[in-house]
């Protein structure tokens, strides 16, 4: 059974722009979300999907696998669906990028 956790992360949120990079206790929110996921699965099974080069850069700095997706995705689920077209798995687990705890 092949699966991955996909963490969709959008930089241009309407209510809180840049939310995935918000500092929470010294770490960007997206890094905290990734760290929580890594407690239950191998880091090789986690991927951040984003339309933002800023988020991609932070992921690179923390050695988090990431992929740039279209800025036309309206929802996180749309972003996961785009990943599914590029990476073949049996299951895609969608963990929202604003779940740092």
Predicted stretch roles:
Residues 2-49:
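N-terminal glycine-rich phosphate-binding loop and ensuing alpha1 helix
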């Amino acid at each position: 059974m092949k699966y991955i956790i996909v963490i969709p992360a959008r930089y241009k949120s309407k209510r809180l722009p840049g939310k995935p990079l918000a500092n929470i206790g010294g770490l960007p929110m997206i890094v905290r979300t990734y760290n929580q996921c890594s407690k239950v699965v191998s880091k090789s099974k986690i991927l951040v999907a984003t339309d933002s080069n800023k988020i991609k850069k932070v992921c690179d700095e923390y050695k988090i696998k990431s992929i740039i997706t279209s800025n036309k995705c309206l929802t996180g689920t749309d972003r996961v669906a785009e990943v599914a077209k590029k990476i073949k798995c049996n299951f895609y687990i969608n963990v929202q990028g604003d779940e740092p705890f």
